[in-house]
Each structure stands twice: as C-alpha cells, then as structure tokens.
C-alpha cells in the first residue's frame, strides 16, 4: 500500500515539473505531502490511496495551512472507501477537491473535469443564465423542458437560477434537446474559502508561546500550525510585499531539528519567503541556516530588523 502511494507521489512530482511547476521535496508525517508553485498558482497537495482516510482534523489543518500560505489544497487519490475513483470526476473531502492522477494530468493539459460526485450520484455545473436565455429564445416552456428532462418544473427553475445542479443524465437530455453546450468545467485551482484560521497557543510549550508572542510584538501576524514541518507561519506586509516567514521553534539544536529546518529553508524559497529557526538555547553560530535565540529576538525592534537580520545570515550562507 505504501509503495503505491510512493509511486503516485513521484508521478505527481514528475507531472508538475513537466508543466513548469517548482515542487518541494515530498514530506513525511505532515498534513500535506508537497507544495507546488508556478506564477500565481500555489498548490498544497495531499496524495492518498484512499481519499476517505483523510480525517476531519487533517483536512482542517490542510485547509488552514493552504489559507495561511495563500494556496489551494488538492487531494490526488486512487479510491474512495467503497470504490475506485472515476476518471474525469471531482470528489470532495470536507470541502477539499479530490481527483485521480489522470484527471489532474488532463486538467494541467487544458481539459478540466466536468463531473463532480455528491450524495446521490454524479452531477455537473451548468450555465443557468444561458439555459434560460436559450429556452426563452426557442419559445420552450419550463413545463416542456421539465418533461423532456424527466424532472420537475421547480428543478428547471433551480438550474436556471444556479440554486441546484442537474445530474449528468439530466444535463445531457437538456443539452441534446436545446442543442447548446451548457456544462461548465470545474476549476481545480479555485481557493477554498471555508476555513477560519484558529490560532491555538494554549497547547504549546511556554518557550514556543514566548517566541510567537515576540514575533507578534515585532509586527508580524503569526499563525500556529500542527502536522507540518514548521511550527508557525509569520506574515508581514512591507513595501507592498507580503513577507512569509516559516518558523521552527525548538528548545535546543540536534540533528533532527537541523534536518527539519534545512527542509523548511528550501520550502520557504519555493514560497518566495524566509525560514527561521528560533532556539531557546543557541549554543553556536550556524553556517547554513538562519537561526536566532529567543534572547536575540527580544533585542530586535521591529519586523524589518528581523527580516534584514535573516537576509544578512543568508548572505553569509551563500
């Protein structure tokens, strides 16, 4: 099972790179597997064999991180709990779109999926405005169209006012009868808008709380994250530019901390941001990482000073 997921992850990386996306290295034990970026598109991807294995909490965290990083969450999967996923169909897991690798590939090549799965079957989004205009121009009554499509007059009214979407069969009958294309493609890169970003500081160790409070005092807006390779994301608007700071906060340094911080440094470059490792006890200077102690952080005056300090550390690295 794991091997199948690993293969799917490599295929996704290859596909995204072939479409000129910059892709992060795959992640372990995180609510997302990779970040892919191209121009103004930013995807936060989760790769799963069974899309129903994503829990409500995991999906909440995936949506939260996507919102903080100004990206779109997307799941690439193989099956649902009950059956293999259909090609060309968009599934939904707690308001995150999920598609097969083949559907994703078609989308990147310019053929968006038209069908989405919901309780009760497969549905399509149609252009209700065009439906109404064409029906009226052809002098066809709501009753007549309802009869042809095998639905109620109320259903036709709902399609025309975009209050409901028809099943695939009903849409085909309507399109055939009116001889006009009505079905709209589904945008996989549309941002998900339903997540209020909760900031839970109460479960954090004291030194982490302290570090985040100092970042906020410097003028950053900081968000705590779980199930990610970083502990917090700090943001600051400066010179009409959003500075994103991926932050790891640790008690002291060890190999695992360093490995994670190096990974986050690479990820921050992909996001045109910065990374920072904040240590409660900093025992030495670091050659290849922006690192500060909580004491050093306390001495800074504002966000600009910290960003400039990180830039100078990065110049030393290079």
Swiss-Prot record:
Pfam family, one: HTH_3
GO MF annotation terms: DNA binding; DNA-binding transcription factor activity
Span of domain HTH cro/C1-type: 131-189
InterPro entries named among the record's database cross-references: Arc_TR_HTH, Cro/C1-type_HTH, Lambda_DNA-bd_dom_sf
Residues that span the membrane, as ranges: none
Keywords assigned: DNA-binding, Transcription, Transcription regulation
Descriptive protein name: Putative HTH-type transcriptional regulatory protein MJ1164
Organism phylogeny: Archaea, Methanobacteriati, Methanobacteriota, Methanomada group, Methanococci
């Amino acid at each position: 099972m794991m091997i199948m997921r690993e293969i799917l992850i490599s295929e996704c990386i290859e596909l995204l790179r072939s479409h000129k996306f910059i892709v992060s290295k795959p992640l372990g034990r995180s609510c997302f597997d990779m970040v892919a970026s191209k121009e103004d598109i930013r995807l936060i991807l989760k790769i799963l064999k069974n899309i129903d294995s994503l829990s409500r909490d995991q999906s909440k965290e995936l949506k939260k991180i996507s919102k903080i990083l100004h990206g779109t969450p997307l799941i690439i999967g193989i099956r649902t709990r009950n059956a293999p996923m259909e090609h060309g169909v968009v599934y939904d897991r707690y308001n995150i779109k999920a598609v097969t690798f083949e559907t994703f590939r078609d989308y990147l090549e310019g053929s968006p999926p038209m069908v989405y799965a919901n309780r009760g079957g497969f549905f399509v989004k149609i252009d209700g405005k065009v439906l109404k205009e064409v029906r009226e121009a052809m002098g066809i009554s709501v009753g007549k169209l309802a009869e042809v499509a095998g639905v109620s007059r109320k259903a036709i009214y709902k399609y025309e006012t975009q209050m409901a979407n028809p099943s695939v069969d009903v849409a085909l009958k309507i399109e055939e009868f009116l001889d006009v294309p009505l079905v709209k493609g589904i945008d996989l890169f549309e941002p998900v808008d339903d997540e209020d970003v909760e900031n839970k500081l109460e479960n954090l160790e004291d030194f982490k709380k302290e570090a985040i409070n100092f970042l906020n005092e410097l003028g950053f807006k900081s968000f705590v994250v779980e199930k990610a390779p970083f502990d917090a994301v700090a943001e600051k608007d400066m010179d009409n530019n959003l500075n994103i700071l991926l932050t790891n906060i640790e008690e002291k340094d060890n190999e695992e901390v360093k490995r994670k911080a190096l990974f986050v440094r690479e990820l921050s470059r992909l996001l045109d941001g910065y990374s920072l490792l904040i240590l409660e006890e900093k025992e030495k200077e670091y050659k290849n990482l922006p690192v500060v102690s909580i004491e050093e952080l306390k001495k800074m005056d504002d966000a600009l000073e910290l960003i400039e300090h990180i830039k100078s550390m990065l110049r030393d690295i290079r």
